[in-house]
Amino acid sequence: KTQYGYSVRVDLFNTRQESDRLRTIVDDADFRAARLIVGPVYEEELPAVIGYAEEYAVPVVSPLADVKNVDSDVLFQMAPPQMRKYAKIEELTQGEHKQVILIYGEKNDREFEREILAALQGVPYARHNYRYAVKEGDQGLSSLLANGKDNLLIVLSDSGLEVDRILAAIASANTNLVARGKTPPRFTIVGNSRWNRFGNLDRALYFKDRLVLFSTYHAKRDAEVIKTFDSDYIKAFGALPSLYSYRGYDAAMIFVPAMYSDIQYDMEGRRYTPLQTSYTFQQMPGGSNHVNQNWMRVSYRPDFTITVD
């Protein structure tokens, strides 16, 4: 209301993941007065809502699901599809002096490997096996960095300890090369967003190693826009917001104003960034759903800044 001047009534319904409960909700008078439906969260609950929404031309926003089995022109999907996860890796692999190297550990994330290999189709790459036990450390990784090329290193290890060792070894190799008067290596590391579950990683290495991660959502607590939102949220609810809270805010800021215009067509191809995560909605080839195409590429810089695109 304060930003756009709209006064909106919000009705909340809990489906409890029960089909009978969902049918009751769809028949509810307050539900049928809605001009915008956000949810349900789970894809299997969408068909009951979509049937009503199509009949009365009410937009439906799916905030979290990567929808596979529901197709409708009234449906907007906020979560980017898995198939688009590494769309932004292409420009990292381009260049006359580019060298792409997959770094394997003793235990590797095979799903991540499959995703990367699919994204690298047609791109030449080399493989490097990192083994801490053979004391390869800096020496083995120094040879990767000192090749005079623009290196893209993709770390496939699925061990928190091993990932930390690899990142530390690369940072050490870079420091040693520069200290010996060598040309500063040019390199970027692509990591796995699932590393966030590792509690032992030295996050300072992310910056030293110019790490790039791909994520469905990004909200950095010390960013000014996030700090402002967090402060307002705490005042209102007495607790820190979760990622679901951020997504809910994004949904409101994108779709409530759109509700007052031609939502089906005015939004297509436009870029929306309510907080730090950006959304661009397009209909997928052969489908009717309006799907956010934008995975966030989070880049850690040596000057200890983070860029998001």
Where are these regions (language model features)?
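Extracellular/periplasmic periplasmic-binding protein-like sensory domains
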Residues: 167-247
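Periplasmic-binding protein-like
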Residues: 32-42, 61-63, 99-105, 148-167, ...
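Beta-alpha junction/loop-to-helix N-cap segments that form part of ligand/metal-binding clefts
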Residues: 6-68
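An alpha-beta-alpha
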Residues: 77-131
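Glycine-rich, charge-decorated loop segments at or immediately adjacent to ligand/cofactor-binding or catalytic sites
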Residues: 71-76, 138-142, 195-208
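Extracellular glycoside hydrolase catalytic/binding regions
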Residues: 61-62, 68-85
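Segments of small-molecule ligand-sensing domains
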Residues: 238-245, 249, 256-308
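Short beta-strand elements in bilobed, periplasmic/extracellular small-molecule ligand-binding domains
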Residues: 3-16, 72, 102, 121-136
